[in-house]
């Protein structure tokens, strides 16, 4: 069995003035083997056009992985190598780690904005 990796996916609930609106990430925690493909889901109910995936490593601030300004629009951030995203609707921006590596062990955050 290959080396196991632990991915901590932070559940990030953002406040935008709507009590029933939210942004959710899943799974909340993920352990996988090196080389496996991993997908982290991000779903928002605000109907925001802009969505973002960040990672935060020990001793560092947030670093942008990928972002989207609307359906079918995806862009690379500063640390996009080894990751991909897709945006087939307004609500979702899944992040895929193509081949999990120990260098991708991190806390992941999804965010959205108008």
Swiss-Prot record:
UniProt xrefs under Gene3D superfamilies: Immunoglobulins
A GO-annotated cellular component: plasma membrane
Disulfide bonds: 42-110
Top-rank lineage group of the source organism: Eukaryota
Compartments, record wording: Cell membrane
Keywords annotated in UniProt: Adaptive immunity, Cell membrane, Disulfide bond, Immunity, Immunoglobulin domain, Membrane, Receptor, Signal, T cell receptor
Pfam families: V-set
Biological-process GO terms, alphabetical: adaptive immune response; cell surface receptor signaling pathway
Signal peptide per UniProt: 1-21
Chain ranges of the Ig-like domain: 22-114
Keyword Cell membrane in annotation: yes
InterPro entries: Ig-like_dom, Ig-like_dom_sf, Ig-like_fold, Ig_V-set, TCR_beta_variable
UniProt xrefs under PANTHER family: T CELL RECEPTOR BETA VARIABLE 10-1-RELATED, T-CELL RECEPTOR BETA CHAIN
Quaternary state and interactors: Alpha-beta TR is a heterodimer composed of an alpha and beta chain; disulfide-linked. The alpha-beta TR is associated with the transmembrane signaling CD3 coreceptor proteins to form the TR-CD3 (TcR or TCR). The assembly of alpha-beta TR heterodimers with CD3 occurs in the endoplasmic reticulum where a single alpha-beta TR heterodimer associates with one CD3D-CD3E heterodimer, one CD3G-CD3E heterodimer and one CD247 homodimer forming a stable octameric structure. CD3D-CD3E and CD3G-CD3E heterodimers preferentially associate with TR alpha and TR beta chains, respectively.
Function statement: V region of the variable domain of T cell receptor (TR) beta chain that participates in the antigen recognition. Alpha-beta T cell receptors are antigen specific receptors which are essential to the immune response and are present on the cell surface of T lymphocytes. Recognize peptide-major histocompatibility (MH) (pMH) complexes that are displayed by antigen presenting cells (APC), a prerequisite for efficient T cell adaptive immunity against pathogens.
Protein name (database record): T cell receptor beta variable 10-1
